[in-house]
Amino acid sequence: MARYIGPKCKLARREGTDLFLKSGVRAIESKCNIEAAPGIHGQRRGRQSDYGTQLREKQKVRRIYGVLERQFSGYYKAAASKKGATGENLLQLLECRLDNVVYRMGFGSTRAESRQLVSHKSISVNGQTVNVPSYQVRAGDVVAVREKAKNQLRIVQALELCAQRGRVEWVEVDAEKKSGVFKNVPARSDLSADINESLIVELYSK
């Protein structure tokens, strides 16, 4: 399955919520009519079945983190095999992706831009270049922008934007050095309350 490269507003309208696919310079409501479904007429959504609700939640989370269907299924299997709550394990695995950590640290204004930085070898982990967006970052790892990319305007602007919106507590960043530490894997209470991971667990349990 190919990665979606079309309009981001279309995805937000499909899920009826902000997927944080845009930079956040303007409120999502001023850019996308997320109350209306995709299409010219933007019909209002009808009542969904339980399955439809579960599927939409999975698609929402998958799109937030920019993960393909097969990848997401793999993350779920890994989460189910670990101790603890499967839904929480799933979100933690997604949060530990390198492209997501780069986004959380503010080196990229969106997860898509952060993924591109990783793929273009602009990011290092513990001093070693890593170009795999799905690389799992561990507590204590140092994630940094490589010297060759430090002066990129988009990185400078992303850091400024992150300073405005605020940075999550589980990363510590030196904006001048463009380097940060992934302090710990976030607890479920640290993550978005707008995600209902139990619906995803119910979907995969069928």
From Swiss-Prot:
Q: Which residues form the signal peptide?
A: none
InterPro entries of this UniProt entry? Ribosomal_uS4, Ribosomal_uS4_bac-type, Ribosomal_uS4_CS, Ribosomal_uS4_N, S4_RNA-bd, S4_RNA-bd_sf
Assembly information from the UniProt record? Part of the 30S ribosomal subunit. Contacts protein S5. The interaction surface between S4 and S5 is involved in control of translational fidelity.
User: Does Repeat show up as a keyword for this record?
Assistant: no
- Residues folding into a coiled coil are none
For this record, an example GO cellular component is: small ribosomal subunit
Family, per entry: Belongs to the universal ribosomal protein uS4 family.
- Function statement: One of the primary rRNA binding proteins, it binds directly to 16S rRNA where it nucleates assembly of the body of the 30S subunit. With S5 and S12 plays an important role in translational accuracy.
Keywords, A to Z?
Answer: Ribonucleoprotein, Ribosomal protein, RNA-binding, rRNA-binding
Q: What is the lineage of its organism?
A: Bacteria, Pseudomonadati, Pseudomonadota, Gammaproteobacteria, Pseudomonadales
Q: Give the S4 RNA-binding domain ranges.
A: 96-156
RNA-binding found in the keyword field: yes
UniProt record, GO biological process: ribosomal small subunit biogenesis; translation
Molecular function (GO) terms listed? rRNA binding; structural constituent of ribosome
Q: What is this protein called?
A: Small ribosomal subunit protein uS4
